[in-house]
Amino acid sequence: MNCSAFSFWFVCKIIFFFLSFNIQISIANPQENFLKCFSEYIPNNPANPKFIYTQHDQLYMSVLNSTIQNLRFTSDTTPKPLVIVTPSNVSHIQASILCSKKVGLQIRTRSGGHDAEGLSYISQVPFAIVDLRNMHTVKVDIHSQTAWVEAGATLGEVYYWINEMNENFSFPGGYCPTVGVGGHFSGGGYGALMRNYGLAADNIIDAHLVNVDGKVLDRKSMGEDLFWAIRGGGGENFGIIAAWKIKLVVVPSKATIFSVKKNMEIHGLVKLFNKWQNIAYKYDKDLMLTTHFRTRNITDNHGKNKTTVHGYFSSIFLGGVDSLVDLMNKSFPELGIKKTDCKELSWIDTTIFYSGVVNYNTANFKKEILLDRSAGKKTAFSIKLDYVKKLIPETAMVKILEKLYEEEVGVGMYVLYPYGGIMDEISESAIPFPHRAGIMYELWYTATWEKQEDNEKHINWVRSVYNFTTPYVSQNPRLAYLNYRDLDLGKTNPESPNNYTQARIWGEKYFGKNFNRLVKVKTKADPNNFFRNEQSIPPLPPHHH
């Protein structure tokens, strides 16, 4: 080998060594590289509040756990993010996306932390969390009957600020005030006004989305296909939602509620249930009559602890007490509703009554409770949901209720919400959420518990109920709801860029015939599948474009 050839070979080897070393450093230190990249977009200013946390920060675990609503996912073995970004403006979101792409981190976007499977803050591969807690402004314009809501706001904040501006307006979102609007709206979002006004997603008229290239898009610039997709198809599949523009709805100055408990043997509860399932979805849209069954631990006459099951029937009626009592006595006399069972409340007070975070009868509360993001007790839980299209036979419902007595239940509950009303009139393709005409009610099964070591036992109990009810619920496919995400339906490999065949199995359960349109939108908006998780919408493989 001559000298010049040797020199060239030596130089090439040195270059290759340094390139390899740099690549190894890049792979070994994605956290440091993310911080370096972020500082290039957003120069560090010590005067600004801290909004980036790494595993070396004292507040890291506090920030991470603060909005994890399901205590199943707070164990030491739960995968943790390398970085948590808590943006205070859109530029922080843009930098988070661009830097995550650059250093090879996946992104999980968290609004309120209620994801049933924890996918808004858990990944099996290296990841960063974009936690939107600091972006929670609600700007209400009563003149146009609209509001811009940042995606980190909670439902409680939305209801509170609308009510502050005008108590005759509200928004048709869910019951739980600590749920974040980022996920709730983008998955559909049902609640007390569903039979009047449809879902939360049916009442969204604009949005700000930060896409895979870090660009901020509104409805006009994103186009109608992408705007359609983020309202019920899961916004996290297409980018990060920064804000929603919502259409306010009119509510009466007073509404009437009742919530009655029925403590009787199972056959008596089933008789009431059967009457409920025959009529609840047929009522005028001004009445939402729900029911739920739950376990209670009581002490019998001999001082022994035992489990019993109580039934509860609860209403929200957009009218007066006399009208509601008259309606119930004519249509559902078995329930025995009396005037003394009812309360006439302002709309905001009905929201608080059904919020689950206060005891309305004993608490000295104000509507400011809706602003408390930590209201309510956190537990570990598991949940599955079904849609019912035909009456469940009484004999079957007896056996379903009997499962609440099984030892593995923890605190078990079945909750049933009637559909019908305007839900029957909205096309199943209006937004990606397809569960409209033909759905009588939704039925969900849940167990809650305290100890981490009991996780598997109680999760398996919920699975056993779900398996038992198979013949009595929707079929071919068995329908599901994105906001009650269920990884038992199937999951894709988040490291794999193309998972269409796998994803179709669960995608058609969530979205029905809308799944293929979502895939086409994804293929155009995020062809390399940067925004992905175990149940994300996949793009089509390149040869299928």
Curated annotation (Swiss-Prot):
Pathway: Secondary metabolite biosynthesis; terpenoid biosynthesis. GO terms for molecular function: FAD binding; oxidoreductase activity. Optimum pH is 6.5. InterPro entries: BBE, FAD-bd_PCMH, FAD-bd_PCMH-like_sf, FAD-bd_PCMH_sub1, FAD-bd_PCMH_sub2, Oxid_FAD_bind_N. This is Cannabichromenic acid synthase. Residues 77-251 form the FAD-binding PCMH-type domain. Disulfide bonds join 37-99.
